[in-house]
Regions:
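Short, solvent-exposed loop/turn elements at beta->coil junctions and helix N-caps
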Residues: 33-40, 106, 114-119, 385-389
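Rossmann-like S-adenosyl-L-methionine
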Residues: 136-143, 147-427
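Short, low-complexity Ser/Thr-rich regulatory SLiMs
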Residues: 52-56, 120-122, 187, 388, ...
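Internal alpha/beta scaffold segment
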Residues: 72-114, 134-156, 175-184
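Extended interfacial segments that mediate partner engagement and assembly in macromolecular machines
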Residues: 1-105, 123
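Carbohydrate-binding surface patches
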Residues: 118-121, 126-137
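Short, acidic/hydrophobic/Gly-rich beta-strand patch recurrent on exposed beta strands
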Residues: 63-66, 130-132, 286
Length: 427
């Protein structure tokens, strides 16, 4: 399918779901904006995860799982990922042969190397290589891996060629110098399908890489959530910023804030931004990223939004000293997972009664469900903006602006007038 056809399909998908699930008609209940596509629909992913295994002949294979299975389809170069990934995979494969590092077998729970995670900073060109292992590497293997990374960075051969069967040409970098700023071993001892463990050991460079969304810098560790298409994420967030219509005085709540990507992006135009996220590590990252950028008008909380927000406003019913009445937020931003907003969170939004809601969605079906609820409880859907962040896939992001009605549906009073009993002739 051509990229133009993909964009047309995705915009229709959003419109159809809003109609079918939400009962919302394009051009009647809301304004549909033309989808924002990519300049280049390839090589846009800054993150790739490759399972590692062995084929029936004992050869090392790396690639992707076949649909709904754990059978690995060998693939060194996916056209959606960075072109340096294949160079790194080839080098790691040779290193495994050189140091006799076995792939992990999830059926018998034997072996060492489970996955290879590669992250790339598109604005900084920094690369992170993270090996997910069942146990910590032997010292000689770890030291050998560091030498491989140093050689990749220098543009020379990546192999130590210590075993008699090594083929130095298979791991030659062809003179291309990489910028691997972080080499991490993530240890996952659990016999589960969860990819990453909790323990990280940095073998080379920093425990993180850096990248930007707009002019906001982020530190990204193996465990960090970060948008996989940062260039198009900037397009998405600029649209969210436009819909928020901030003047510099508003109180903004970001109710699925993650590591603070949207919160920090909006903070430069807001009076105060509050982020809420249930994952403690994400909030730590958000606070660190705020400090990294010198942003002091953002505050982050761990917990469920409906609980955090209620407690916050009970403790701060008075003016906060800035001259802004903080008992009522001006804008709420939500960027939920594919399952959409929790029912209690939607209740919280209505109770908080913001002037505007900016809903960032990665699933137009659950978006339609949630918009139906909000439209029935005092909010008008103003604009719907599809954004393609994942070319050559079926996924589409959507940004929606909702505005509070001056009078909520439940506030209307029905009055019945019997004209037959009235004299309506002029005096």
């Amino acid at each position: 399918m051509s990229y133009a056809a993909q964009l047309k399909y995705k915009q229709k998908l959003v419109s159809d779901n809003l109609q079918r699930i939400g009962g919302l008609t394009e051009g009647v209940d809301y304004e549909m904006c033309d989808i924002l596509g990519m300049d280049t629909p390839f090589r846009y992913r800054n993150k790739a995860q490759y399972p590692v295994g062995e084929d029936k002949d004992g050869n090392i294979i790396m690639g992707f799982y076949a649909g709904h299975t754990h059978s690995i389809i060998p693939c060194d170069d996916c056209l959606l990922g960075d072109e340096n990934n294949s160079v790194i995979l080839t080098a790691v494969r040779q290193w495994m042969k050189d140091y006799r590092v076995r792939a992990y077998n999830e059926n018998i729970h034997k072996g060492t190397l489970r996955h290879i995670l590669i992250r790339t900073g598109f604005h900084t060109d920094e690369i992170m290589v993270c090996l997910v292992t069942k146990k910590m590497l032997r010292k000689e293997a770890a030291d050998g891996l560091v030498r491989v990374i140093e050689r990749l960075n220098s543009g020379s051969s990546a192999s130590d060629n210590i075993s008699s069967g090594s083929d130095n040409n298979t791991s030659n970098n062809s003179g291309r110098k990489l910028n691997i700023a972080s080499l991490v071993v993530n240890i996952n001892k659990e016999d589960t399908n969860v990819i990453l463990g909790r323990e990280c050991v940095t073998l080379y460079g920093r425990p993180y890489i850096e990248d930007y969304i707009g002019d906001i810098k982020f530190q990204i560790s193996p465990l960090s959530f970060f948008q996989v298409n940062p260039k198009q994420t900037e397009v998405l967030y600029n649209k969210a910023l436009e819909f928020a219509n901030l003047t510099g005085n508003e109180a903004v709540w970001d109710l699925y804030c993650g590591i603070g990507t949207i919160s920090l992006f909006l903070a430069k135009n807001a009076g105060m931004v509050y982020g809420v996220e249930i994952v403690p590590q994400a909030i730590e990252d958000a606070k660190n990223n705020a400090g990294l950028n010198g942003i002091d008008n953002a505050e982050f909380f761990v917990g469920k939004a409906e609980e955090v927000v209620t407690a916050f406003y009970e403790s701060r019913k008075a003016d906060d000293g800035t001259g802004h009445n903080m008992t009522r937020p001006d804008v709420i931003v939500v960027d939920p997972p594919r399952k959409g907003c929790d029912e209690k969170l939607l209740d919280t939004i209505v109770t908080m009664s913001p002037q505007r809601v900016v809903y960032v969605s990665c699933d137009s079906a659950t978006l339609a469900r949630d918009l139906k609820v909000l439209s029935e409880r005092g909010y008008k859907i103003v604009k719907v903006q599809p954004v393609d962040q994942f070319a050559n896939t079926v996924h589409v992001e959507t940004v929606v602006l909702l505005s509070q009605l001056k009078q909520k549906p439940d506030d209307y009073i029905n009055v019945t007038i019997e004209f037959d009993d009235m004299d309506i002739t002029s005096a």
